[in-house]
């Protein structure tokens, strides 16, 4: 017998046995997470089966092995029947990223921790030039978390993954005693593929290049702050959380000479621009009036004494493109969902070296330093 056919038969037999055991019905009767759900026994199995496997619903997860195993052809996006036509994988590199999410509250205007956990890792891969393919999901659950809340976040992750075109292929769950956590923490790791033709990095940046952003800044951080209800002000600000991989692919397709990209999450736009300036040894000159900030968000920042350039974002990125390609870049982004407010905000200059300078609305200049402290803790 062909070893490949034998392997397929063995796999089918294992899957049949799993399905037969599951059909006996391992029911999740609890309304709240208990320590038993993290103990590895029947309660754990019921939680995994009835919340995660059924919630994410894909073949790789259903096998419930210690690792999600799938052909490289699937990661590359090639159909299995075309495997023989694929000469090799030498035209690609693999990219991997991981991030943990502890946002408080877990639901906020415009999104939730589940959606954020998928989008954040997808975006980290995308701005590295990778095409995101698969992600993992690790959960730290606090005893007493309503199962209904967990189901909601699992569904939010599934919806976000489908929108981003990625699959959740493996995961883990742990439960900590009440008071040892705060409802729900999530870690995600992702893998993507990078065509070798893409050369993104600070070493590609040149004097005269333009700095662009894909959208308005500071919405996410201020949305979470408002949702906490600790402040005497209220503002209907929605988080910008979204996957930006479609925007990135559009930009790289239209402007393959794009030099560098970053998503401006913790520390905001000001921090990532400082990191770029330090890495290149060049200066960054930006214009205050060119940076898109929604009026409601700017007003909330002003009332709290917070500079929006340091506030976290979860659905926009910053990029450096050649000066003669900036119009093409902006036209491309503005034609795509989520990129309507893309803007040219500045340029790369020789001096001041390794520094960021902002030209204010009044024609003056001020230094934009690295963020000091953490004015907005647990915003992602």
State the predicted function of each range.
Residues 40, 47-48, 142-144, 237-313:
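Active-site-proximal betaalpha loop/short-helix elements
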Residues 2-51, 368-376:
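N-terminal amphipathic/basic leader segments beginning at the initiator methionine
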Residues 34, 42-213, 219, 224, ...:
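Glycine-rich phosphate/pyrophosphate-binding loop regions near the starts of catalytic domains
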Residues 64-65, 311-316:
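Short Gly/Ser/Thr- and Asp/Glu-enriched loop/turn motifs at secondary-structure junctions
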Residues 328-338:
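Short amphipathic alpha-helices in soluble, non-transmembrane regions
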Residues 121, 157, 273, 297, ...:
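Aromatic/hydrophobic pocket-lining residues that form π-stacking "cages" and hydrophobic walls in ligand
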Residues 13-14, 336-380:
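Acidic, Ser/Thr/Pro-rich beta/coil linker or hinge segments at domain junctions
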Residues 321-326:
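Helix N-cap motif at beta-to-alpha junctions
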């Amino acid at each position: 017998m062909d070893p490949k056919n034998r392997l397929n038969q063995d796999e089918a037999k294992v899957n049949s046995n799993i399905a037969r055991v599951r059909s006996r019905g391992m029911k999740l009767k609890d309304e709240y997470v208990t320590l038993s759900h993290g103990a590895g026994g029947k309660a754990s199995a019921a939680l995994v089966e009835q919340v995660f496997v059924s919630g994410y619903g894909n073949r790789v997860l259903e096998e419930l092995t210690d690792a999600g195993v799938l052909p490289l052809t699937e990661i590359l996006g090639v159909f299995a029947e075309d495997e023989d036509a694929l000469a090799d994988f030498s035209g690609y590199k693999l990219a991997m990223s991981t991030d943990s999410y502890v946002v408080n509250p877990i639901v906020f205007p415009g999104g939730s921790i589940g959606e954020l956990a998928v989008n954040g890792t997808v975006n980290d891969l995308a701005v590295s030039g990778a095409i995101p393919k698969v992600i993992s999901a690790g959960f730290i659950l606090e005893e007493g978390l309503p199962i209904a809340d967990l189901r909601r976040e699992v569904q939010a992750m599934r919806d976000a993954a489908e929108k981003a075109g990625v699959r959740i292929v493996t995961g883990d769950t742990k439960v900590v005693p009440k008071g040892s956590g705060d409802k729900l923490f999530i870690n995600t790791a992702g893998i993507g593929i990078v065509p070798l033709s893409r050369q993104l990095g600070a070493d590609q940046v040149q004097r005269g290049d333009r700095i662009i952003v894909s959208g308005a800044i500071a919405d996410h951080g201020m949305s979470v702050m408002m949702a906490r209800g600790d402040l005497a002000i209220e503002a209907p600000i929605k988080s910008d959380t979204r996957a930006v991989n479609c925007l990135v692919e559009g930009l790289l397709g239209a402007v393959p000479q794009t030099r560098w990209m970053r998503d401006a999450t913790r520390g905001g736009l000001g921090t990532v621009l400082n990191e770029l300036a330090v890495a290149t040894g060049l200066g960054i000159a930006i214009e205050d009036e060119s940076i898109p900030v929604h009026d409601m968000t700017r007003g909330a920042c002003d009332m709290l004494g917070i500079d929006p350039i340091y506030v976290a974002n979860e659905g926009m990125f910053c990029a450096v493109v050649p000066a003669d390609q900036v119009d093409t870049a902006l036209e491309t982004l503005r034609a795509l969902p989520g990129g309507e407010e893309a803007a040219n905000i500045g340029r790369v200059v020789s001096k001041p070296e390794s520094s960021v300078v902002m030209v204010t609305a009044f024609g003056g200049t001020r230094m934009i330093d690295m963020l000091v402290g953490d004015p907005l803790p647990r915003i992602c």
